[in-house]
Amino acid sequence: VAAREIVTCKDYYIAYYSAMDYWGMLTQPLAKTFVVVTKRQQPPKNLRGQFRFIYMKAGKIWGINEERVHEFGKIRVADIERTIIDALDVPELCGGITEIAKGIWIRKKEIDYRKLADYVRRMNKPVIAKRLGYIMEILKIEKTEIINELKGYIHSRYDFFDPMLEKAGKAKNSWHLIDNVTPEQIKNIIWS
């Protein structure tokens, strides 16, 4: 709610780690609020440790819900599918691939996978499709039609599965991702 009061543009939304928190995709508390804004701005000096504003062009603002937050009114927050897309686009703003995979696992029954695939197409970034497809395979989320659609984004380029981690000497997989986080590491974090 505080974010709504300090942004200077109407096309803002709660995003990344904060949206994951809103949708119950985290297992730990969050101290900072991540807000996408269409006008470059900084949080007030006294709130810089509590807020992070991420600039995005207005045409990229979609997949947003207005959600009632107690008696304080409504806030704009990424829907669960847009939350996943944003997270896979910039894992650094969501704690990395293991946090994202854990969040997908926690909410796997509430996710609209058709909508998620449509959002992948709308973003048109192959790395998002590759990360999502690989995570779905690791977690055994059996949506064959969606996974096959995501495989259509695989080209010759290799990307890092998790850009936050070490960038050398790792195996490559069929999704053309460099495995700097292994499937076993993800499974151990989720199922431990």
Predicted regions and their residues:
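Glycine- and acidic-residue-rich phosphate-binding/metal-coordinating active-site segment common to enzymes
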Residues: 49-77
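Hydrophobic alpha-helical interaction segments
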Residues: 66-192
